[in-house]
A protein has these predicted regions:
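Conserved beta-strand segments of alpha/beta enzyme cores
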Residues: 206, 279, 310, 403, ...
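Conserved S/T- and glycine-rich ATP-binding loop of Class I adenylate-forming
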Residues: 85, 139-142, 183, 235, ...
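Conserved AMP-binding/adenylate-forming
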Residues: 264, 268-356, 375
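Nucleotide 5′-phosphate-binding alpha/beta core
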Residues: 1-138, 145-176, 231-236, 251-252, ...
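Conserved adenylate-forming
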Residues: 2-5, 188-307, 389
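Residue-level recognition of short loop/turn positions
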Residues: 143, 315-317, 381, 458
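AMP-binding/adenylate-forming catalytic core of the ANL superfamily
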Residues: 235, 335-442
């Protein structure tokens, strides 16, 4: 076919400003393949020439900015960032008293949490922010109701140099180019956004977010043929999705698997490594913070990955715990211009080690990370149901908190705390929507509990629990 047939349209250039005819051809090939899954979205990196320069500079700083850090006050560049943002970010000006000496009084700054993003995001966006490039991400909802997180294309694209850096630490040095698929993000959900695109930072190589739910494919054999045809260089996904991929025996030979979103068990990690004969790199990341750490190649915890993020372990009062003592992982900094973070409590716990690591990376390590445990649900018919799918159903109702549990016999129980009174939530409608997701055979009880969480420390609930075990 003539190259002119692959000239990008105006809409393509809006989504992918640097796309070339080869990129158009790649997207068309992925999208129109006879075994392609059901696509329901179109997306691009929105990266322009200035963004690409900034991404390459960020990649260089990932290598050169890895100086050893000490417990106590943050490095000077973090203090400079906070000082620069204080008059422009309402939340910062409220938290940092005038005249506070941050080098010696850092712990006097009040911490922030997920709740600040949920109900007061307008206090976090700088007053002078240029909103022309604003995009909004919705968190997966693995810890409860999803958050709406303001984001920027350049900040989102920084994931790519960080992924490349982590791959390099495992001896993998990819040479991405047009015409190849660099990465596929594997999901196993009842419904999720799915699309193919190309990424400018990776030289126009292909990328796809794919749902391996069998109902999303033309035939039972289609995912096997599709993965074999496009042979992605590496894969990303959560442990639940990789476990399901392994169960489906999809023939793929990735250079690495990068797991994220929920905790990866040692048993599943070993089985994935044996099955796919490649490194399994556990990745600690939140939508609000971006990537925080990657698993040390020598097995010594998680190295803090980005140089522009300051990580603490703090107690309930916001005081730093001693090195190697357990505390809540709390972060400051990042590169999202629409969501600067100041002592943001992640809700995850671990111990910080500032000592030298045998792998050679000088950045601090998070030891014994207590992240989000993987939770698996099954429909009565046997299909997998991801907690994200349940979140998508429940977010349509006026709820403050919820606890959803599936028993070993596949029956379910849901307790909810409504925003208003007990009559503000229609239990019958909740049951109908859950049956639409799980199937009409689902046995489920819904209980309205206006004081759910009140008797627990911090008012926290456990949104998802399951008596089913993730296959390892």
């Amino acid at each position: 076919m003539k190259p002119s047939l692959f000239q990008p349209t105006e809409e393509m250039l809006r989504r992918n400003p640097l796309i070339k005819p080869g990129g158009v051809k790649m997207i068309k090939r992925m999208r129109e393949h006879p075994d392609a899954p059901r696509w329901n979205h179109e997306a691009g990196d929105r990266v322009g020439r200035e963004d690409l320069k900034a991404l390459k500079a960020f990649e260089a700083r990932l290598r050169t900015g890895r100086a050893r850090r000490k417990p106590g006050a943050p490095p000077p560049e973090i203090i400079q960032m906070v000082n620069a943002l204080r008059p422009r970010v309402l939340s910062f000006s409220e938290r940092v008293p005038s005249g506070l000496g941050m080098e010696g009084e850092w712990e006097k700054i009040a911490t922030m949490s997920r709740e600040d993003v949920r109900i007061g995001v307008e206090k976090l966006v700088p007053l002078d922010a240029d909103l022309d490039q604003l995009i909004v991400y919705k968190t997966a909802g693995t810890t409860g109701h999803p958050l709406l997180v303001p984001h920027h294309p350049r900040a989102a694209a920084c994931y790519q140099p960080m992924l490349t850096f982590a791959l390099g630490k495992y001896g993998i040095r990819p040479r991405f180019r047009r015409g190849m698929v660099a990465c596929m993000l594997v999901c196993a959900q009842a419904q999720t956004v799915a699309y193919p695109t190309v990424l400018s930072f990776w030289n126009g190589a292909g990328f796809a977010k794919i749902n391996i739910n069998p109902s999303e494919w033309p035939t039972p054999e289609s995912p096997h043929r599709y993965f074999k045809e496009f042979s992605p260089f590496f894969l990303t996904g959560d442990p639940i999705s990789f476990s399901e991929m392994m169960k489906m025996k999809i023939p793929v030979k990735p250079a690495a698997l990068v797991t994220t979103a929920v905790a990866l068990s040692t048993g599943l990690k070993k089985r994935l490594e044996k099955t796919y004969r490649c490194p399994v790199i556990d990745w600690y990341s939140l939508t609000e913070t971006g990537p925080i750490g990657y698993a040390c190649p020598k097995g010594h915890g998680y190295h803090v990955l980005p140089h522009d993020l300051y990580v603490e372990a703090v107690d309930e009062e916001g005081r730093q715990v001693k090195a190697r003592e357990r505390g809540e992982i709390t972060v400051t900094g990042g590169r999202n211009p629409f969501l600067p973070l100041l002592r943001y409590r992640t809700g995850d716990w671990g111990r910080l080690d500032f000592g030298r690591c045998p792998c050679g990376d000088s950045m601090p390590r998070i030891l014994d990370l207590e992240g989000r445990a993987p939770v698996l649900f099954r429909a009565p018919g046997g299909s997998i149901i991801n907690p994200v799918d349940v979140s998508r159903v429940l977010r349509e109702f006026p709820l403050v908190q919820h606890e959803f549990r599936q028993k070993a016999d596949l029956s379910c129980e849901l307790e909810v705390r409504p925003i208003a009174g007990p009559d503000s939530v229609d239990s019958g409608k909740v049951i109908r929507e859950l049956k639409n997701l799980f199937g009409p055979e689902l046995k489920v009880k819904v209980r309205i509990k206006p004081r759910l969480g009140d008797r627990r420390r911090g008012g926290k609930t456990i949104p998802y629990q399951s008596d089913l075990l993730l296959e390892e």
